[in-house]
Regions:
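Short, solvent-exposed aromatic-acidic interface loops
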Residues: 17-29
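Short acidic-glycine loop/turn motifs at beta-strand connectors
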Residues: 10-14, 85-87
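Extracellular/luminal recognition modules and glycoprotein regions
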Residues: 3, 26-33
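Short beta-strand scaffold segments in enzyme catalytic cores
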Residues: 4-9
C-alpha cells in the first residue's frame, strides 16, 4: 500500500523525480516549506532539488521510504508538481503524467497553507 507522491524538478532537457512512498499527503507542504527555506536558490536547480529532498526526508534514517530517480512512477496517488527553476514556476501533472493546465509561481505556491494530519 502506501501514500505515494513525486515532485519533479526540470534539469536541462530532463527531470529529476523525488519520491515519497508513505507521505504523499504531506509532500505539498514540505515543498512549500522548502521553497521558503531555499528562496535564495530558486534559480539553481541542483541546490533547490537537494533542499526539497532534505525537507521531504527530514531526519529519516531508514533505507526505504524515499528515492531519487529519472522516471515518473505509474502508481503515484497525488498530482505531480513539476518545478522549472529558469521560470521559477510549477506546472502540474495528474497522476498519469498529463498536464492539468495549472501553473503557479514559486512565490505563490510557497505562501499557500496546507492541511496536515
Amino acid at each position: 500500500m502506501g501514500d505515494r507522491a513525486q515532485i519533479a524538478v526540470k534539469q536541462g532537457e530532463g527531470r529529476i523525480y523525488l519520491y515519497s512512498h508513505w507521505d504523499g499527503a504531506g509532500v505539498y507542504k514540505k515543498l512549500a516549506d522548502a521553497l521558503v527555506f531555499g528562496k535564495s536558490r530558486w534559480s539553481d536547480e541542483e541546490y533547490l532539488t537537494r533542499i526539497i529532498f532534505q525537507k521531504m526526508t527530514g531526519d529519516n534514517k531508514d533505507t526505504t521510504g524515499y528515492g531519487i530517480g529519472l522516471n515518473r512512477h505509474n502508481d503515484i496517488e497525488h498530482d505531480i508538481p513539476v518545478l522549472d527553476c529558469d521560470s521559477q514556476t510549477i506546472d502540474w501533472e495528474d497522476r498519469s503524467g498529463s498536464p492539468t493546465g495549472t501553473k503557479q509561481s514559486f512565490a505563490d505556491f510557497s505562501v499557500q497553507t496546507f492541511e496536515t494530519d
